[in-house]
Structures are given as structure tokens and as C-alpha cells.
């Protein structure tokens, strides 16, 4: 069984680095920065394929004090429904590209503040909703795999 390593530095030619991004597509920290520097991620593109990577939005910037003359912004997790829809689109994309192998990082579990359980269960919900054969070209982090396997969604 293959798992996505915590510090993925190199990909095979058919490999795609799957990372969590913010809704502005500013890839300035965590796995997003790795995707930008090593795997062709594009600043300004919040979701989807880019270079040898694929972005899934997990966080956004929100106004903290909108009533002030000079509002400040802070980061927040995207709503779960937004993450779920992005996971749906990702799974559909993987099913349309069987020639590629997708290495999913622990998206959203760093800067964005999601727990492993929350993200893995969001993927589980997305996987369970598909009426097509589940793609076998996704490599999961061990922690995600254990939850998906427990729920009977991966072998």
C-alpha cells in the first residue's frame, strides 16, 4: 500500500501534487508554497489542475472588523459545503485522468485548521456520492486512508 509522504519533494512523471489552497489562490505557505515552488502551481488560481499539481480550496480570507474605516482580514476555513464541492470536482477529475496518479497531501490540516477527521470524512462523503467506479489513481495520506478504509470506501 502506498501513502503520500508528509514531505513529498519529488513526483514521478505521471504524479500530481494535491494541496490545499485559499480562495484567492495565493500559494504563500504550507503545501501550497511547495506546489508553487516545485510543482507548477499558479498564483491566482485557487482550484484545479496547474502544472504538476491540483489545488483544493480549504481556507479563505474574511473581514474581521468590517465596520472600521480600515478593516482587517483574517483567515478562516471555507464552509464544509465549499470543501465538499471541491472534493467532488477533484474526484471527478481523477476519474477522467486515469493516466495520472494523484498524491493527496493532508489538505486543510495545517494553516487552514481542519482536523484530519473532518477532511477525510468530507472526502468520504464525496466518494460515497459517486455513481461511477471510484478511481484507483489517488494516493492518500495514511491518516486519510485509515478513515476511508474504515468507512469501506477504499481497499
Model segments located where?
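Macrodomain-like recognition of ADP-ribose-binding/processing modules
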Residues: 1-155
Amino acid at each position: 500500500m502506498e501513502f503520500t509522504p508528509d514531505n513529498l519533494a519529488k513526483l514521478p512523471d505521471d504524479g500530481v501534487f494535491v494541496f490545499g489552497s485559499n480562495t484567492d489562490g495565493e500559494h504563500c505557505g504550507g503545501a501550497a508554497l511547495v506546489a508553487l515552488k516545485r510543482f507548477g502551481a499558479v498564483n491566482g488560481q485557487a482550484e484545479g489542475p496547474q502544472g504538476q499539481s491540483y489545488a483544493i480550496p480549504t481556507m479563505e480570507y474574511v473581514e474581521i472588523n468590517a465596520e472600521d474605516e480600515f478593516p482587517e482580514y483574517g483567515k478562516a476555513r471555507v464552509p464544509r459545503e465549499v470543501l465538499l464541492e471541491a472534493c467532488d470536482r477533484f474526484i471527478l477529475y481523477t476519474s477522467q485522468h486515469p493516466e495520472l496518479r494523484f498524491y493527496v497531501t493532508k489538505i486543510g490540516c495545517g494553516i487552514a485548521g481542519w482536523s484530519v477527521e473532518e477532511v477525510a470524512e468530507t472526502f468520504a462523503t464525496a466518494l460515497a456520492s459517486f455513481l461511477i467506479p471510484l478511481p484507483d489513481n489517488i494516493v492518500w495520506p495514511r491518516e486519510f486512508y485509515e478513515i476511508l478504509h474504515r468507512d469501506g470506501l477504499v481497499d
